[in-house]
């Protein structure tokens, strides 16, 4: 890999690792998210950094992503990366709780509905827990809308990049 590519990879890998260290140290037995701000921070470190990484790599390696396009992509690169993460958090609540001992639904959202992270899988708490998810659904929807805008800013000539972004 050329020196610029190595520097890009190093920069964003370090950002991700240092950020994730905070969550692992704070909750060594399983991640617990306190509030919506911390939810955003978690999503940034685990996925927003990937949005930056890809954007920087594409700018460096693709002749169709000039400075003007790059500037526009930077506006939405974090939600581009975070969209899949926010959707996966919503989709995998039970799996994360049972297998990873991780609760990404913020404590304050659950408390506002009369529930708690300890009751995330309790059938009796299901209505309260579902109500607590509404703000996270809005976050995911916003991330998806902004990620689509990100893809729209990619040049039509960047076919492989556009396909990478659109196809799982």
Language-model segment annotations:
Residues 1-83, 90, 94-168:
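Catalytic cores of Mg2+-dependent Asp-rich isoprenoid enzymes
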């Amino acid at each position: 890999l050329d020196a610029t590519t190595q520097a890009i990879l190093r920069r964003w890998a370090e950002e991700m690792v240092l950020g994730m260290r905070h969550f692992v140290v704070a909750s060594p037995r399983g991640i617990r998210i306190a509030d919506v701000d911390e939810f955003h921070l978690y999503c940034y470190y685990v996925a927003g950094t990937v949005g930056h990484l890809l954007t920087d790599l594409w700018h460096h390696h693709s002749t169709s992503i000039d400075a003007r396009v790059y500037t526009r992509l930077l506006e939405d690169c974090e939600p581009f990366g975070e969209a899949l993460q926010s959707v996966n958090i919503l989709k995998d609540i039970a799996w994360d709780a049972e297998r990873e001992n991780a609760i990404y639904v913020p404590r304050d959202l659950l408390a506002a509905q009369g529930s708690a992270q300890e009751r995330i899988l309790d059938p009796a708490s299901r209505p309260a827990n579902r109500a607590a998810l509404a703000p996270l659904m809005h976050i995911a929807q916003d991330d998806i809308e902004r990620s689509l805008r990100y893809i729209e800013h990619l040049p039509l000539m960047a076919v492989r990049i556009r396909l990478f972004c659109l196809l799982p």
